[in-house]
């Protein structure tokens, strides 16, 4: 007898800026950084879940029409990712706050899922993220290509008119 056990779906947003940086969230109590992402609730679309999770984990309120659908990616044995992307101007991260909490099994306290935020160069993903996330962000998604596609210009490009 076999049981079909579908993989859970986690939805999130890859937030880029034109300085070739990616917004990452530090996972509380862990050594790694991650994208704002999380599980899809019953009745939600992947886009709805990505917007909600980004808001809960960072406080950012993104507009649906600002997101580009990157698609679904194999992630772990139990989970797939559905990711979207957007480009934003680089902004001060001091105002970001994680509203999503979990019960810490050691202290018994409610802690934020994310306890820090940072803009990081694309090349730093492997040093900061888990190997599975590094595979997605480093091999399956071309961050440079996404940036060019969303902005219409290469990273760091300054038009002659803007330079004058």
Give the location of each predicted region.
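Short, P/G- and charge-enriched loop/turn segments at secondary-structure junctions
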Residues: 1-3, 70, 103-108
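Conserved N-terminal beta-strand and adjoining loop/helix that marks the start
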Residues: 1-22
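Active-site-adjacent beta-strand/loop module that shapes the phosphate/pyrophosphate-binding cleft
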Residues: 73-106, 118-123, 136-147
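Short hydrophobic/aromatic beta-strand or adjacent loop that forms the aromatic wall/cage
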Residues: 8-12, 79-83, 114
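Charged phosphate-binding loop/patch that engages nucleotide di/tri-phosphates or the phosphate backbone
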Residues: 122-164
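A short coil-to-beta-strand element that immediately follows conserved catalytic motifs
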Residues: 61-71
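Conserved Nudix-box catalytic region and its N-terminal flanking loop in Nudix hydrolases
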Residues: 17-60, 164
